[in-house]
């Protein structure tokens, strides 16, 4: 179980700063605007571990439960490097984009809530969707779900492999983005949509460059303006050792593009219409908004 040490919790549920000199003196405007009352911030620096009775994910991200905090900037490296090779495959439960074994370069992530925990290596992106465009995301944002939710899974490099990292409380981080469905196609996503029929059956795959396969969401990642909280994997084995990093501002895709994901076949050889887990109890864990 992941542990984020709680500095101190006041009776109103807000976070008290260890060092008042480290507290924010004002709340800068962010986009999209967050209409919630500011909480006392945590000190600057990466987040240490926290322990709670249950840290299952996904959750409903309520702005009223969040504390605005200055954290070190997130640093994404080599995500679209030409040396990164990606395998897009139908796992029977989702579309997954794995870094190929022969990839010369492997993207990394550091900073933010991970600053005290080292460098995290990108392992895969996988996608969640639902039967309807308003039911596709796993996390809710102020009780609202989106059409698509993407999870970029990273593992702490001190554990060498994803499988080993899953055994440790500081082993994993998942960067999350959302997509809202409308009438207009997302041109960056269209190449992938055109390839989905070639992996309609489970355990089929195609090889791509990182730019062809990951560019459709790369603009979402910023050094700040994200939520972070301690949670779990949303698929088996549901280990509670994930630093979640969630960008609330959605990108846009078309309903037609979302439907293309639903047309993929599951392990049971039926259309995979939904693969999103239900929201789990919040359990008063820390919820941070990085500014």
Language model features with spans:
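Alpha-carbonic anhydrase
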Residues: 2-291
């Amino acid at each position: 179980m992941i542990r984020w040490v709680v500095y101190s919790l006041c009776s109103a549920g807000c976070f008290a700063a260890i060092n008042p000199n480290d507290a924010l003196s004002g709340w800068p405007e962010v986009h999209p605007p967050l209409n919630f009352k500011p909480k006392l911030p945590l000190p600057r620096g990466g987040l240490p571990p926290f322990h709670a009775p249950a840290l299952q994910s996904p959750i409903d991200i309520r702005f009223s439960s969040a504390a605005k905090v200055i954290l070190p900037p997130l640093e994404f490296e080599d995500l679209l490097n030409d040396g990164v090779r990606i395998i897009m495959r139908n796992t029977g439960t989702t579309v997954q984009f794995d870094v190929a074994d022969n990839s010369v370069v492997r993207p990394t992530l550091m900073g933010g809530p991970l600053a005290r925990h080292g460098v995290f290596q990108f392992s895969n992106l996988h996608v969640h969707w639902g039967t309807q465009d308003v039911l596709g995301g796993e996390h809710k944002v102020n009780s609202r779900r989106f059409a698509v939710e993407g999870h970029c899974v990273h593992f702490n490099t001190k554990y060498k492999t994803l499988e080993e990292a899953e055994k440790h409380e500081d082993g994993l981080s998942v960067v999350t983005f959302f997509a809202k469905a409308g009438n207009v196609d997302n041109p960056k996503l269209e190449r992938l949509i055109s390839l989905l029929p070639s992996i309609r059956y489970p355990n089929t795959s195609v090889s791509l460059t990182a730019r062809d396969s990951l560019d459709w969401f790369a603009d979402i990642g910023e050094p700040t303006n994200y939520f972070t909280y301690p949670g779990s994997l949303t698929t088996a084995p549901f280990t509670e050792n994930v630093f979640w990093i969630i960008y609330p501002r959605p990108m846009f895709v078309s309903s037609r593009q979302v439907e293309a994901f639903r047309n993929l076949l599951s392990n049971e050889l039926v259309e995979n219409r939904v693969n999103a887990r239900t929201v789990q109890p919040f359990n008063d864990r820390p919820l941070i908004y990085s500014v």
